[in-house]
Curated annotation (Swiss-Prot):
BP term (GO), one: translation
Gene expressing this chain: rplQ
GO CC entries: cytosolic large ribosomal subunit
Name of the protein described by the UniProt record: Large ribosomal subunit protein bL17
Disulfide linkage: none
Keywords linked to the UniProt accession: Ribonucleoprotein, Ribosomal protein
Family membership: Belongs to the bacterial ribosomal protein bL17 family.
NCBIfam families cross-referenced by the UniProt entry: L17 (TIGR00059)
Lineage: Bacteria, Bacillati, Chloroflexota, Chloroflexia, Chloroflexales
PANTHER family for the chain: LARGE RIBOSOMAL SUBUNIT PROTEIN BL17M, RIBOSOMAL PROTEIN L17
Keyword check for Signal: no
Presence of keyword ATP-binding: no
Length: 116
């Protein structure tokens, strides 16, 4: 029984899931919106929200924390160029998930996750 175990496993090991979240976050920061499955979008949304909340204050410590989550200096730089100005006065709610319907090949529910 998985009582009181928060978070989605997505049928992956811990390392695989961590790499998936990192890649989705980097893609979302670079492209502002990505098309993925609904389960992946819902799983990565809190991670992205927390990352943007960290990036709102541009301090060396915040940059180190963001880099530890992203592992991409280019994505970290891009995040810190737009996050303080765009989301400075906003407390949460930085992303939006829009359902797109089922995928043709396997019927997986697709979604668009985008930065507001």
């Amino acid at each position: 029984m998985r009582h009181r175990h928060a978070g989605k496993l997505l049928g992956r090991s811990y390392e695989h899931r961590k790499a998936l979240y990192r890649n989705l976050m980097i893609a979302l920061i670079e492209h502002k919106k990505i098309k993925t499955t609904l389960a992946k979008a819902r799983a990565v949304q809190p991670e992205v929200e927390a990352l943007i909340s960290i990036a709102r204050e541009d301090t060396p410590h915040a940059r180190r924390m963001a880099l530890s989550k992203l592992a991409s200096k280019e994505a970290m730089r891009k995040l810190f160029t737009f996050a303080p100005t765009t989301y400075g006065g906003r407390n949460g709610g930085y992303t939006r998930i829009t359902k797109l319907g089922p995928r043709r090949g396997d019927g997986a529910e697709m979604a668009l996750i985008e930065l507001i």
